[in-house]
Amino acid sequence: MTISKKQSAATETASRVSRRGFLKGASLAGVGGVALGAGMLADINGSRGVKAAEGEPIPIGGGVPLTGWAAADGIEFKRALEMACEEVNAMGGILGRPLAPVFEDTKEQGADNIMPAMQRLIDRHGVHAIVNGYNTGAVTQEYDIIADAGVIYIHHNTDIVHHDTVGKDPERYFSIFMGDPAEYWYGPGLLKFLNDLGEKGQWARPNNKIAIVTGSQNYSVVIANAIRDKAAEYGWEISLYETVVVPISEWGPTLQKIRNDPPAVIAITHWVPQDLAQFCIQFTPNPTNSLVYMQYGPSLAAFREIGKENTNGVLYSTVIASLQDEIGNDFNTRYKAKFGASASPLVAAQVYDSAHYYALAAALAGGTGEPGEFEQNKKVADRLRRMIYRGVMGTTKFFIPEQASIPYPDATKDPSLGMPHQYLQIQDYTTEPALIAPAPYETSQFALPPWYKA
């Protein structure tokens, strides 16, 4: 099934729910139409007479970047898996068997690091499942290692290639799930968000132009192309499509092109925070009357630390982070209490939720399967495919047969059936960004940037 068909099918009318009613019921749990939460595991264990996790340990793997450029995030992935396993074990484990997390370093990532790490987790540690954050550069090359072993693999690589690989051969790749929506959704998601601002009367676009600036990495290019290719459907035109050589600190030539034909929106899909901060520093002394949207980088503290007041007003989004609601904030608080004020629960949330819903699915399936135990792992995979899970990031429900998370509101109008595509704005660089969309999760309202003239 193509993205366009999926989008059309997934966005059929669904009942609207009030913020209060939705959030009140959100922590309930279920399979095949009822939302499941982590606490259901204790009930399952209790119904089986399990009082403690005292059986043979179940090795659960994490292939994470503990060294290299992504080590800061890798540390959070490791902490999250350890924390989730501790909580699962406190509820009796998986039918009385405790989880034992083990790790292999994916270093600088890329296929030459990722594939051996996955192989070691299977061959050396005998893991029953691998629950990762993101690893870049392998582009699904590790999937055959997983498929040959048949173990459950949940990752958060945010990669549309996953849809193609698993969707075309779901029998071979039955055990592989992407726990977040693909990067593609950042494109149509942004266009819908911009139109929603206009429909709500929060912003009146001065024209229909979007200037797109991208780096050369596939992640950035996929998002840029999605914005470009879908723009006309949402009533926009592309005034500039610029690919910059990265890393980049001198934005003068690109800014001149933008100033020569001022757009309503500047969308930068390059993501390195230091580079994006330099754009803000060089943009604000002579700004265009444009909203500025940037990819990923503004979520990192380095962006605000470098750009300071020049970052106020910048928009960004994420398809995967803990929410600022009752459930999300409870996790955020507990995570920082455990690992320190500088820890990042927004990054950790992806592994935390996935480890919990894996444990729940395995318990419902009657237990886990080690490498080579295909029949049992197929039972676990079937439970994952049917599951609707409400965690700290919102709802996880998978596209079938692609086995990738469905985004809300990009592909479904029902917040109980999709992971929220969160839009945030830096309104004061000295504080945390404001969550301004989507409903019913927003905690603040959009504000016009300080450089903008209404």
Predicted regions located by residue number:
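Extracytosolic ligand-binding ectodomains
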Residues: 2-6, 16-27, 37-454
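N-terminal intrinsically disordered, low-complexity tails
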Residues: 11-13
